[in-house]
């Protein structure tokens, strides 16, 4: 299962969807496409990106939040949340912002 966690100005993604065998997993491809498609924009706008090579994991964190950066991260979060609602057995989505 892919685990997506959203906290104040931060998104963390980890795990595998296991929707289908390697190379045919459309759920994993969709999540990866959203996140990795946005990475160049995030990296050019001073967002801290951390990857863990030992496990499939990635964190995006707004170092100096601005309205532009918050909007960009919000768009990515909304896309991922939509996928999680469509594939709840393969993607967990935890929004910790409501607890802050």
Swiss-Prot record:
Its EC number is 3.4.22.-. GO terms for molecular function: cysteine-type peptidase activity. It comes from the Bacteria. It is an enzyme of class 3 (hydrolase). Pfam families: Peptidase_Prp (PF04327). One of its GO terms (biological process) is ribosome biogenesis. SUPFAM superfamilies: TM1457-like. CDD domains: Prp-like. InterPro entries: Peptidase_Prp, Peptidase_Prp_sf. Keywords: Hydrolase, Protease, Ribosome biogenesis, Thiol protease. The active site is at residues 16, 28. Homodimer. An essential cysteine protease that cleaves the N-terminus from ribosomal protein bL27. Belongs to the Prp family. This is Ribosomal processing cysteine protease Prp. It comes from Mycoplasma pneumoniae (strain ATCC 29342 / M129 / Subtype 1) (Mycoplasmoides pneumoniae).
């Amino acid at each position: 299962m892919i685990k997506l966690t959203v906290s104040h100005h931060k998104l963390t993604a980890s795990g595998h969807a296991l929707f289908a065998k390697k190379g045919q997993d459309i759920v994993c491809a969709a999540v990866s496409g959203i996140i990795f498609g946005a990475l160049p924009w995030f990296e050019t706008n001073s967002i801290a990106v951390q990857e863990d090579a030992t496990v499939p994991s990635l964190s995006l964190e707004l170092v100096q939040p601005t309205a532009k950066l918050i909007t960009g991260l919000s768009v990515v979060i909304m896309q991922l949340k939509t996928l999680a609602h469509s594939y709840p057995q393969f993607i967990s989505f935890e929004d910790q912002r409501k607890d802050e």
